Amino acid sequence: MANPLRKTMVYLGLADEELDYQQGQQPAQQQQSPVQAVPTPAPAPQQQAKRAPVTPLHKPSTTTRNAAPAEMNEILTVHPKAYKDAQVIAENFREGVPVIINLSQMTDDDARRLIDFASGLSIGLYGKIERVTAKVFLLSPSHVAVSGEQSATEAEVEASFFGR
């Protein structure tokens, strides 16, 4: 009798059912005929299924484009009251508009969080972030040049703000 695993495999269709013959009861044909090699038929050519045109998963994004160096027509000044105002800053900076951020109406924790966001934004879009006063920052795109000197007191203020 076959083992239970073999029976289960046959039941599930994972193996062919083999008849268990005792050695003395084998069919006469198998004893008389010599083993012959059966020629393997050539594989039939498979028809190529028509494929549908491929559509890209990701649409071309305008967020990675660099702002075109154009004539500067405006500078945006933002007085954020909460972190959610960062979206306005990001949208305008992405368009190539320099943004002045006045943090005087924000708490220190929210101001730090917004400056961290603005720093990442400026680095990601190859811009620059500069401190103008203790709570005012300038985000300038890569095509905008800002000139001026940084005094010793401004350097101390910058160190005290970021050194917390």
From Swiss-Prot:
Keywords: Cell cycle, Cell division, Cytoplasm, Septation. The keyword Cell cycle applies. Residues 21-71 are annotated as: Disordered. GO terms for biological process: division septum assembly; FtsZ-dependent cytokinesis. It comes from the Bacteria. Belongs to the SepF family. Homodimer. Interacts with FtsZ. Cell division protein that is part of the divisome complex and is recruited early to the Z-ring. Probably stimulates Z-ring formation, perhaps through the cross-linking of FtsZ protofilaments. Its function overlaps with FtsA. This is Cell division protein SepF. It comes from Clavibacter michiganensis subsp. michiganensis (strain NCPPB 382). The gene is sepF.
